[in-house]
Design a protein with these regions (language model features):
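Conserved dinucleotide-binding and phosphotransfer motif residues
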Residues: 25, 124-125
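Core beta-strand elements of the Rossmann-like FAD/NAD(P) dinucleotide-binding domain
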Residues: 2-4, 150-159
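Active-site-adjacent segment of FAD-dependent monooxygenases/related oxidoreductases
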Residues: 54-116
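A conserved short coil-to-beta-strand element within the FAD-binding core of flavoproteins
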Residues: 131-144
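Conserved Rossmann-like nucleotide-cofactor binding loop
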Residues: 14, 37, 167
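Conserved FAD-binding catalytic core of PHBH/FMO-like flavoproteins
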Residues: 144-146, 163-200
Length: 200
């Protein structure tokens, strides 16, 4: 049975960012992820799942040592933002020039962020990546948690972090309540190519 200080259930962007942030802390960290990410092909078409990374997130990703890797792949900076709600009069807009910045942030494919964090975690001697790995059972002891994987292997951890998404298996097993509501909204996501520059 393997013992670690911190077990992170979910090796997506959030789980991997936590793991990379714990690097060098002296804690033994294990990340449990259902799938190993596929390598990113340089000529692959852009993916539709993206995140707007603001300046604070850029600083975090820089501190984690992955921002330059992300920029070297695919990232597009944005200079303005406008947010509104069709059901109210709420509206806000701002731009980089009025705030004295060169840009507000970057739009980055989630897979690019994920792959950069995965590579960083792989390089760390403090982090063990367990993938593919899927939880089957969890039991909370007085000073540690016992995790049983579907392949029958076991792991103990002093701290368990649930980063396994909106429909978290771990959160459900821990009986942590969740408040949510359906907005009755739908979204259309697309990649658009323009003949003329759009001055993002």
């Amino acid at each position: 049975m393997q013992s670690v200080d911190v077990a992170i259930v979910g090796g997506g962007m959030v789980g991997l960012a936590v793991a990379c942030g714990l690097q060098g802390s002296g804690l033994r960290v294990a990340v449990l992820e259902q799938r190993v990410p596929e390598p990113l092909a340089a000529n692959a078409p852009p993916q539709l799942r993206v995140s707007a990374i603001n300046a604070a997130s850029e600083k975090l990703l820089t501190r984690l040592g992955v921002w330059q890797d992300i920029l070297s792949r695919r990232a597009s900076c944005y200079h303005g933002m406008e947010v509104w709600d069709k059901d109210s009069f709420g509206h806000i807009s701002f731009d980089d020039q009025s705030m004295g910045y060169s840009h507000l942030g970057h739009i980055v494919e989630n897979s690019v962020i994920h792959y950069a964090l995965w590579n960083k975690a792989q390089q760390s001697s403090d982090i063990t990546l367990l993938a593919p790995a899927e939880l089957q059972q969890v039991a909370w002891g007085e000073n540690e948690t016992f995790l049983t994987l579907k392949d029958g292997s076991m792991l103990t951890a002093r701290l368990v972090i649930g980063a396994d998404g909106a429909n978290s298996w771990l959160r459900n097993k821990a009986d942590i309540p969740l408040t949510f509501w359906d907005y009755q909204h739908h979204a259309l996501v697309a990649t658009i190519s323009t003949e003329e520059p759009h001055d993002a």
